[in-house]
Amino acid sequence: MIKASKCNKARALFLVRTSIPRTFIRNATSAIPTTVKLKDLSSLPPLTKSLPTNLPFLMPDTLHNLLRFDSKKEKQPSTDKSNDKDKPSRKEKGKDKEKENEERKDINEDEKYDIKEETDSKPTIDPNNPVSSKSSISSSSGGANNNNNNDDSDGRDDDGSPKDKEFLSPSDAGLHPPFLAIAMKDRPFLPGATRHLHVTDPEVIKCVNHMINSNIKSPYFVLFHVRDTNSEDAALDVIKDRDFVHEVGTLCQIIKTTGSEILVYPHYRVKLVDISTPNSRSERIEMEQDNSQTSYLKKFEVSYAVTQQLKDEPYDEQSITINAWTRRIKELYEKLAPKYEQPENKEEIMNNPSMLADFIASKVHAKPEQIQQILESSNVETKLELSLQLLQVEADADEMRQTALKNIRERTEKAYAQSLIKEYTKELLKAAGIGENSKVHKFDERIKHLKMPEEAMKAYKTEKERLGTQSDMEQNVVERYLDWLTQIPFGVYTKDSFNVKKAREILDRDHYGLKDVKDRILEFISVGKISGNVDGRILCLAGPPGTGKTSIAKSIAEALNRKYTRIAVGGVQDVHDVKGHRRTYVASIPGRIVTALTQAKTSNPLMLIDEIDKLDTTSHGGAARAFLEILDPEQNNSFVDNFIEVKVDLSKVLFVCTANYLGSIPAPLRDRMEIIEVNGYTKNDKIEITKRHLIPAAAKKVGLEEGRVVIPDETILRLIDKYCRESGLRHIKSLINRIFSKASRKIVEELEDTDADPHSREIVEESLVAKENESVISDKAKKDAGSSSIESNDSNTEAKVSTTTENEKKQEQKQKQDEEIKKLDLPADLKIEVKPETLKDFVGPEIYIKDRLYETLNPGVATGLAYNTSGDGDALYIESILTDSISSDLGNAGLHVTGSLKEVMKESASIAYSFAKQFMVRQFPDNRFFEAAHIHVHCPGGAIPKDGPSAGIAFTSSLVSLALNKSLPNDTAMTGEITLTGKVLAIGGLREKSLGAKRAGYTKIIFPKDCEYQLDEIPDEVKEGLTYIPVEWYSEVFEHLFKGISKEEGNSVWKEEFAKLEEKKKSKKTHTV
């Protein structure tokens, strides 16, 4: 039941929100008893001050229901005042003003009557469900209907009977009629603030326009947030199924539409009860929809849902937690208030905890999941806590921003003040004619020792004049340019030394072996001595890693008495790295060439361009083109760096390049170089280098005297064979260092064990005491000598010394001893010997366990030879087998190749297969092996990529061996490219392959006759014990590998298998007939 005061308020409410004459309302409501049931009032959307006053929240039909008219509904005038095509005249305005004054007078009378009614009957407060005594029917502007008000907001009358079933009125089960349901991916909408919604689905847009244009009295929809915002369908407006969205959303009213943009006002939170989608229609909703005012939704392919209003749980207004959090939120909000647009009902929001939580959550920056969590919460305390957390993060971020802005402002003001002081000081010094620029003086002093060309001197003077007339930033650029320009050693040269004898001594001192390399270098120096210079010569040291190319370049520089400088160009792809950046760029510097000259401080250094084969040529060859100019004797006398912008003469520079693989160097660059190949070291060379250089260097590095760690030749040999087979010395050097590190640890542990033995400790202490006595005596003698000199020079010193007590002296001496790190004194007889049997205790288990994969070769297995870019040679085994027996009559003869083979090696295998078939037909015509054999050829070591044509004769021999079912000799390895006609072509790396064959125990090597010239490059110690068999055609290879085989033997190998095959074929024919 509702009292008369509520009727009066409702009457005033209709007057404000509608255009119905007030006199009509007063006359109508005066006849209503005070006990009338008002079923529609609480179900209406809550009002808000932020919406337009001309928005018709209550339709005329609702008014008739309120007045309980049973007669036919009359058409009421439109309340839409937004269309103002016909502007009122001045007379009409005057009448409206008089009417407004009359209505205001009536409102004042109603308010007096309401105050009297409220005084007569004060609302009671339930302790479990506190209410606000300030209003009885008002709801929050955010639309959150609290249970705190003892009014009709629960959707039922005082007697518990259900209300009228208008479009917002809940059913008997407390459910709303079906509404249009829209899914959204962005931040969820919270009640109480007008928002813009963007929709893209054409059906949804049509439905919304229909609701607006058809004057539907229920322009409402429910909005739900998508669960998975990262899914492909997250941007859809139509809900696919119930699990597609969260269960809690908001009921929104459409205010205005503009294309795909909808201005909406979220009223309150709703819970999803049932949903009907275009893909899955709900029978329950469809049946109810037929009699519903929203039945028009069936016309569109949209989703619509039955919802239930989600109300806040009751809470205690006196709760300490709620009051504390509310107070803290208000404090933080006041600090951040300038950032946010202030609502008109701010006071009402601040006094309602639920509205305050929604308002704060709608303002702060947060993830959609966090806002959804607040939206789903019915507990006011929880909502406040979550909103406070978000607001606290916002406040902390704002504080950090303010601090950063303050620091920036302070730095800016300080820099401005410093610049003013600097300019003021500069003007004073200029006016006084004093204060010579120290930097300019430094530049002038530098050029006195240089022979700058005219172009460089002109640039220097021009830039020098600009100093003092530019801004600070520009002046820094000028100073940096002059600094670099005056560091270039124009006209500064070192005198060359062409002493061949001295050069030989330096090369022999620093390098063991490498006879061919040393001879080439000495020839180079001899030519320079005859011609008087080595200008225009560009050397390239090519060889495997770790063979000493860089150290050879240093020895050449020392032999020629030139400065040494190094440029690493591995991976360089930008031409500006070589030629510098222009001064217009921030923090630009010269390129690597000019920088190397400034480091060498001479114009004729030996400049090592290291790893030139690693130069990145993918970026349009920019860096490679720059080196074409630098390494060309006809062009490098006028090299121009982009930063310096003056010509620099590089013709006197001796360029030495290093590379591991010549094929990676661009051909134009390679043509400008004089190639000196630095091959790998032999086994004997490695042993001698280890003894002469690596062991002493490792002992010095760990602080041990030579002889403390003994490594015999047998141990070094085992280290080379089982751990370090590459041509270089880097790996063996690291292993030697590891041996000395382990030996140092063993020595320390052994001494610690000795300290634990009393007898041994006494011996060690006696030796240490004797050493200390010797040091004390020497220190005393020095002290006596020093004290006599002090007495003669200063008479007061003796008095000062006497004042120092003995205890202080002892403390100082002890402190000095603690601070000093003494070297460990080792007994003279303490040594560690690394034997071959104990080598694995120092460097770990052996890497190369077997030298040969096959001790005895089976038919179809051949031994080839291979080598890699690191200079390591090894045996390459070729295995061939039959995948099916010849008598199986499968009819799939062919070749299948595996073993991580690249394109060239696959082609080599195909060529060998074609030639082997032709060769067997010619040599053994009755051997029909290749007619029915499906062969699988494999190269062991599948993880290692293999390429190259040099395994051609090995492939052929493997196939012929399988066809003849005869094994190849165990002592013979082979290398050479094969052609379709059986010609054996030249290959490379014969020296490395010979090392691999000898290490694997092979004594004979079949190689192309065209490679006989390479035998002269192989050291005698490598050729010792090897027999080289040069061949020109494969028939010569066959004679060496298959000696004594007759035609009858070769023709009859597979006769039985082919006989069985023929019988099978005959039986098949008979069966078919």
Curated annotation (Swiss-Prot):
Q: Which residues form a coiled coil?
A: none
**UniProt biased composition (Basic and acidic residues):** 69-107, 113-123, 158-167, 775-785, 806-821
Name the Gene3D superfamilies for this protein: 1.10.8.60, 1.20.5.5270, 1.20.58.1480, 3.30.230.10, LON domain-like (2.30.130.40), P-loop containing nucleotide triphosphate hydrolases (3.40.50.300)
Give the signal peptide, or none: none
Note the Pfam families from the entry.
AAA, Lon_C, Lon_lid, LON_substr_bdg
Query: What are the positions of the active site?
Result: 950, 993
- Give the GO molecular function terms: ATP binding; ATP hydrolysis activity; ATP-dependent peptidase activity; sequence-specific DNA binding; serine-type endopeptidase activity; single-stranded DNA binding
* Region (Disordered) residue spans: 69-173, 775-821
Q: Does the keyword Protease apply?
A: yes
Provide ranges: composition bias, Polar residues.
790-805
Annotated ATP binding lies at: 543-550
Q: Which family does it belong to?
A: Belongs to the peptidase S16 family.
Return the transit peptide range from the UniProt record: 1-27
Give the superkingdom in one word: Eukaryota
**Top EC class for this record:** hydrolase
| Database matches in InterPro entries | AAA+_ATPase, ATPase_AAA_core, Lon_bac/euk-typ, Lon_lid, Lon_proteolytic, Lon_Prtase, Lon_prtase_N, Lon_prtase_N_sf
Read off the HAMAP family from this record: lonm_euk (MF_03120)
Species source reads Candida dubliniensis (strain CD36 / ATCC MYA-646 / CBS 7987 / NCPF 3949 / NRRL Y-17841)
Which reaction is recorded as catalysed by this protein? Hydrolysis of proteins in presence of ATP
Give residue ranges for domain Lon proteolytic: 856-1044
Chief subcellular site?
mitochondrion
Q: Which GO terms describe its cellular component?
A: mitochondrial matrix
Kindly provide the name given to this protein in its UniProt entry. Answer: Lon protease homolog, mitochondrial
Its gene is: PIM1
Keyword field contains Transit peptide: yes
Tell me the subunit arrangement.
Homohexamer or homoheptamer. Organized in a ring with a central cavity.
